[in-house]
Amino acid sequence: MQQNKTVSQQKTINPVYWVPTAYFAMGLPFIAINLVSVFMFKDLGISDTQIAFWTSLIMMPWTLKFLWSPFLEMYRTKKFFVLVTELLSGILFGIVAFSLFFDYFFAISISTMAVIAFSGATHDIACDGVYMAELNKEEQAKYIGVQGAFYNVAKLVANGGLVAMAGALAEYFGAIEGASLEANKGAYSYAWMIIFAVIAAIMVLIGLYHIRMLPSNQIPSTTKKTTSEVGRELVAVIANFFTKKHIFYYICFIILYRLAEGFIMKIAPLFLRASREVGGLGLSLKEI
């Protein structure tokens, strides 16, 4: 009786209470790693080559997440993975924040961000799964705009508000625009530590909020599949995908359609921050 009551209560949770926060939590780690970290590493003296290479490489989990998506069905519920990945990402962002004063901060932070990327990609899979499982087709159509809007709100908050806040904090701690790296590094380290601590706190708070507010009427599957069985099914699906007519034309279109945007997304922040002496625009974080 108590179980039936709990399920009934979960069914009454209005999507407006969890769809915005779930998709905000989906967008925040992606933007923090893909764009915000570029500004941080630039301010802390990492070379453009290393920034472009490593921050691009650690984004691969979002491209390859389909490879482990089927395996999530073998363990627990989708809500479980949403909660774990949100809380884990929050903790790891905290590690990034407090690693900035170590001598090997770049190695520590970039490796930690690689784990966050895997966690964030897994969160995407599980979050979309909750959305599809908990809402009927009419509700999915109704809230499709909400999920897209709050994913983009995360972009504005992270790449807009938090970057500007980093600039204001750096000035507060004594950074002088155009001064040497040695003169400004301490101020920028404190500023970016606070920014990534804020991101960490947001992710943890959303995770705690979702413990109660994220619905989960899913019952873990009683039919246990082995890893090899799931692997064979995945290979079969991929093989079938490539048998579709004109599939290689479609793949080429998908890759080329946003190829230029993909290149400029990573390099543009470096160009905006680079001094005019080396061909950049020399903009401050607040101006960007």
What does each model-found stretch correspond to?
Residues 4-62, 248-279:
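Helix-loop boundary and gating motifs at the non-cytosolic
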Residues 2-13, 215-251, 278:
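Juxtamembrane intracellular "pre-TM" segments in multi-pass secondary transporters
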